């Protein structure tokens, strides 16, 4: 797992360059958001069950057929698996949020996930919506805590949804 600083250093070291203006700005942005990242991670840690519950409620309200007979969240086992997966996305999204780098998501979450879901018949679209509802719940909490710039919250959750949504042409 890498973080924003390690990734930046690796990129510049590979090409044998000193940090340029863009690199310095990237570092400034990352460190400037550090306290907010930690605050949000602490909020997620203390309220993870509530965040997953709120996101699941939003998902099942938006896509109620998931809970009907034949739906992918029908039966206690499938419903529990859905909540477990949402918690998994929340946890790894939090790691990436702190790191400021999506490497942990690529390595531990996304690699092969779309193929696995497709082979099991798990629809991707509701998964993507659920991840977006997680992001929305976190952004609401951050705004309520007075965090004005929440763009760093978008990064990991948008990355997951973008990667899961990709379609090979």
Curated annotation (Swiss-Prot):
(2R,3E)-phycocyanobilin binds at residue 82. It is found in: Cellular thylakoid membrane. It comes from the Bacteria. Its main location: membrane. Contains one covalently linked bilin chromophore. The chromophore is added by phycocyanobilin lyase CpcUS. The modification N4-methylasparagine is found at residue 72. Keywords: Antenna complex, Bile pigment, Chromophore, Electron transport, Membrane, Methylation, Photosynthesis, Phycobilisome, Thylakoid, Transport. GO terms for biological process: photosynthesis. GO terms for cellular component: phycobilisome; plasma membrane-derived thylakoid membrane. It is a peripheral membrane protein. It holds the Pfam family Phycobilisome. Belongs to the phycobiliprotein family. A variant beta-allophycocyanin (AP) which forms a complex with ApcE, a phycobilisome terminal emitter that influences energy transfer to photosystem II. Heterodimer of ApcE and this beta chain. This is Allophycocyanin subunit beta-18. It comes from Picosynechococcus sp. (strain ATCC 27264 / PCC 7002 / PR-6) (Agmenellum quadruplicatum). The gene is apcF.
